[in-house]
């Protein structure tokens, strides 16, 4: 049976990287977290990713080695075709996805896709963005405005205002509920 592709989305500062890092500490035999290929230095940001030059990225894309790819915030992002092998082997695969590119993921994976939108309250989102110190005040305000107006339709919502442990527990419960439903189809 084919696994589910869990497309985790959320605004910058919602805690996606922290959630994925915490999830990796849990023993999950049927859930794999996919790494992303990004045209960003390996030491930039907190995400565990594979850094590529733009040339390397375009070469991989041109050879159909990326299952999904997109451009956002001046960078190119991609997920390798290895996720298709994992899915066909029956593993669930979690991807740090893009809200704007959910339609692309939906078109490719259709009923195997489980879209989850990570949300936090505006106050907590502002605090997290200020604490990480990457954006100035106007950039933070722009990110808050985008977060408020851009929530994808037809996706499961996961609130990340609480503890990471609580959010990971809720995420795993949601994934396992969908696995049971998927197995009955």
From Swiss-Prot:
Pathway: Metabolic intermediate biosynthesis; 5-phospho-alpha-D-ribose 1-diphosphate biosynthesis; 5-phospho-alpha-D-ribose 1-diphosphate from D-ribose 5-phosphate (route II): step 3/3
Disulfide bridge partners, by residue number: none
Catalytic reactions on record: alpha-D-ribose 1,5-bisphosphate + ATP = 5-phospho-alpha-D-ribose 1-diphosphate + ADP
SMART domains to which the protein is assigned, alphabetical: GuKc
Matching InterPro entries: GK/Ca_channel_bsu, P-loop_NTPase, PhnN
Binding site for ATP: 10-17
E.C. number(s) listed in UniProt: 2.7.4.23
EC main group: transferase
Pfam families: AAA_18
Superkingdom, taxonomy of origin: Bacteria
Keyword annotations of the record: ATP-binding, Nucleotide-binding, Transferase
GO molecular function: ATP binding; ribose 1,5-bisphosphate phosphokinase activity
Keyword Transmembrane helix in annotation: no
Any single biological process term in GO: organic phosphonate metabolic process
Tagged with keyword Coiled coil: no
Family, as annotated: Belongs to the ribose 1,5-bisphosphokinase family.
Functional summary from the UniProt entry: Catalyzes the phosphorylation of ribose 1,5-bisphosphate to 5-phospho-D-ribosyl alpha-1-diphosphate (PRPP).
Protein name from the UniProt record: Ribose 1,5-bisphosphate phosphokinase PhnN
Taxonomic source organism: Escherichia coli O157:H7
């Amino acid at each position: 049976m084919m696994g589910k592709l869990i497309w985790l989305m959320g605004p910058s500062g919602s805690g996606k990287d922290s959630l994925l890092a915490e999830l990796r500490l849990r023993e999950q035999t049927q859930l794999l977290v996919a790494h992303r290929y990004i045209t960003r230095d390996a030491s930039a940001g907190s995400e565990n990713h594979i850094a590529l030059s733009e040339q390397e990225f375009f070469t991989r894309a041109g050879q159909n080695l990326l299952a999904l790819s997109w451009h956002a915030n001046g960078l190119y992002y991609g997920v390798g075709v290895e996720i298709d092998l994992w899915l066909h082997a029956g593993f669930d695969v979690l991807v740090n996805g893009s809200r704007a590119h959910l339609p692309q993921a939906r078109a490719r994976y259709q009923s195997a896709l489980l879209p989850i939108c990570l949300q936090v309250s505006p106050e907590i989102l502002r605090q997290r963005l200020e604490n990480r110190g990457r954006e100035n005040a106007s950039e933070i305000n722009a990110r808050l405005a985008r977060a408020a107006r851009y929530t994808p339709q037809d996706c499961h919502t996961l609130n990340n205002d609480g503890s990471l442990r609580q959010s990971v527990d809720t995420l795993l419960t949601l994934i396992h509920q969908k696995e049971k439903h998927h197995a009955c189809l």
